[in-house]
């Protein structure tokens, strides 16, 4: 709720138009069709229960639906690539060729709607020349690999 209020303040102070979802205090959620009647609808989390039922993607199947995942996809699983949304969306924007290939292999529509666009929060690491942290010709430093989420067997 604090974030919602902060966003309202930010946009209002700068006189930037925005659509207020008005979801607090038991208010009925805004009817997107009546308020802005969009031609294209973007989702970052097209899952049931994330949005108000009025904003579910199933209510907009007559519009161009787009999906840009909220998180970096790392799991090769039908659950990630073969939901109803994945198969009916007009465009699915994925971070890399690996994710595109997973969609081609796992989705019923064979990933025909996938476009590889990169992942903005990690794009800054592309083509960056970093110093060679592991190079130590004199073997003067010990190295420790800290990987608490992985098992080395």
Each PLM stretch: what is its role?
Residues 1-126:
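Active-site and donor-binding regions of nucleotide-sugar-utilizing enzymes
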Residues 120-153:
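Conserved catalytic-core segment of nucleotide-activated headgroup transferases in glycan assembly
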